[in-house]
Amino acid sequence: MIDRYTLPDMGAIWSEENKFNQWLRVELAVCEAWAEEGVIPQSDLEKLKHASVDPLRVKEIEKETDHDVIAFVRAVGETVGPERRWIHLGLTSSDVVDTALSLLLVESGKLILRTLSELEQVVTDLAVKYKDTPMIGSTHGVHAEPITF
């Protein structure tokens, strides 16, 4: 995204930090599913819920691995103990990236709908405010009788 054209709220959604947070959200949701199936002990899951991700650390590791998701998994693993072995269990990179992308799209869609709702209200208010303002009418591409907004 080009910063000067990006609204702050939309920029925050598509930031590297939020992208990695959504990746972590996906990873933890899968860990919860594994725990429900009895694969991951509940005590390990509770520790995994405290995992975090540092985007700068991910980028640092990515320079070595040349793989964003591997770098992410390692960076998250550094924030937990031996429970790190459960992170990314049974997943492909695409499972994480594509699912997180869907979450980002939903978040963006909600922002767009909220903003459109605000715009609708502004346009409605202006239409009511200026409903009696005269303007030149038009028909077949030429000026016609005066009308109001």
Task: List each language-model region with its residue ranges.
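A helix-coil-helix interface module used to build multimeric assemblies
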Residues: M1-F149
